[in-house]
A protein has these predicted regions:
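Contiguous beta-strand/loop segments that form the cofactor/metal-binding neighborhood of enzyme cores
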Residues: 183-264
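Short, conserved SAM-binding/catalytic segment
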Residues: 45-53, 113-117
Length: 286
């Protein structure tokens, strides 16, 4: 397969799935062999470069007919475990958006299956390869120990964005959906092991089955502490909705918002979640 294009089946063609599909289309060495989504056959909004690709509404059918080498899974979180296992059983490598599963047991089952089949498993921790976030982490690692890490991402969503969030909350809470990124970042910043985690939450609406707000605290074995907060819904405040701040004995470093030329950043703008205007650094010696 080294001299041939990797045949990719894209499962889930929403915000993330569409982004990945467009990337596969542009990157040499990949060939998209199908798009799979429950409502894909009736869609007329796909970009021109994807519009003529084979479409499937059933994962089993898509795996059998498209015969992919790899599967890109970008569906709602409560399907990740099932679809990963199906892809491995079909002899495919897997890229899956976070979180890997909705339970620890489910995540372990996917990892075990990847090892048993000898296939690659890659999880979409985009911040691990984001240039600005890599620099943010590197700067944090120069601040000494312990670190105090303060992060949040609250989203004042309404209309289509609120519908999307409510659908996500059929699977899990905001603190799990988003928190996996930032706890992973905290682990990289400290290079330490978490020893204690606790959190609280609240359900601020009767339109969801789960809490739509929560915050967690993580303690590490080097004395560092981390805080993360996430809330979704039309009731959420946009005051300090994007905090990415790390403090150590030698100073602090922060990601600052909004973007250049703006006086305000919308909290429900998905693109703003990974954009950075600048890193603000401070030395305790100044």
């Amino acid at each position: 397969m080294q001299n041939e294009a990797v045949r990719v089946l894209v499962v889930g063609v929403g915000n993330m799935g569409l982004s990945h599909a467009l990337a596969y289309d542009k990157i040499e060495g990949f060939e998209i062999v199908g798009l799979c989504s429950r409502s894909i056959r009736g869609r007329n909004d796909l970009p021109a470069e994807l519009a003529s690709l084979p479409r499937y509404e059933n994962v089993d059918e898509a795996l059998a007919e498209s015969r992919p080498d790899a599967v890109s899974i970008n569906t709602y979180p409560n399907t990740h475990e099932e679809f990963c296992l199906k892809a491995f059983d079909a002899g495919c490598h897997v890229f899956v958006e976070k979180p890997l599963a909705t339970t620890v047991e489910g995540a372990q089952a996917v990892v075990d299956k990847a090892r048993a089949t000898g296939k690659k498993l890659v999880i979409g921790y985009i911040l691990r390869v984001h240039p600005a976030w890599k620099e943010f982490i590197a700067r944090a690692q120069t601040l000494g120990k312990p670190l105090v890490m303060r992060m949040n991402l609250n989203q004042q969503s309404r209309g289509p964005a609120w519908n999307w969030h409510r659908n996500l909350m059929e699977s899990l809470t905001p603190i799990v959906d988003c928190g996996v990124h930032y706890v992973d970042v905290m682990c990289q910043m400290t290079g330490a092991q978490p020893v204690r985690v606790h959190g609280v939450g609240a359900q601020l609406t009767d339109q969801t089955k789960v809490q739509n707000y929560g915050h967690l605290h993580v303690e590490f074995d080097d004395g560092s502490v981390g805080w993360y907060e996430a809330g979704w819904g039309p009731m959420m405040s946009e005051v300090a909705f994007f905090v990415k701040d790390v403090v150590g004995p030698k100073g602090c470093v922060s990601i600052v918002m909004p973007q250049e030329g703006q006086d305000h950043a919308a909290s429900d703008d998905i693109d703003s979640h990974t954009k950075t205007n600048a890193l603000l650094c401070h030395s305790s010696e100044i």
